Amino acid sequence: LEHAWSRALNAEGGVKTPDILPGKNGSTIQSATSEALGQKRYLAMFEFVEGSEPDQQDDLTGGFEELGEIAAKTHVHSIDWDRPEPFERLVWDLDTVFGQDATWGHWRDGPNIGTQTRQVLEQVETTVIERLTQYGRKPDRFGLIHADMRLANLLITDGETRLIDFDDCGLGW
């Protein structure tokens, strides 16, 4: 799905993304087994895109404005886009982000979280949960999202910006 959406955004949504290169068999997803890993892994290859992420030492105002524009375009596109079947992606809801079995683990287990930081983040978590619960999960509010859209996932070259790293895309706010 992430490949289909990335291509559709590039073709229809006004968001530049790297092209996905098919293997010899024509599929954009390949599999390989390594003795070192002991199990099958799935692979994808993307075109190499020149560029660099916005420099955090610079004024990032323009970068965040562009990030907001790209986020808006992906949101608008995802509302009307016909998702391919079968559709299986991560769901980024309150349970998978804040719950006991959160997809990426619990923020409380992160490094260097002292008492003061923990207290602030607990207040933030409570507020986010309350607001998202009130906001609801109607289709125009909870749908397909990139889920890792940050300046580090923008590649800029010659005034053109590309959005990369769709592997976490799923359903969320």
Positions of the model-derived regions?
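Catalytic-loop of the protein kinase fold
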Residues: 141-146, 151
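Mechanochemical coupling/switch segment within NTP-driven translocation systems
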Residues: 116-135
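Conserved catalytic motifs of the protein kinase core domain
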Residues: 41, 140-142, 159
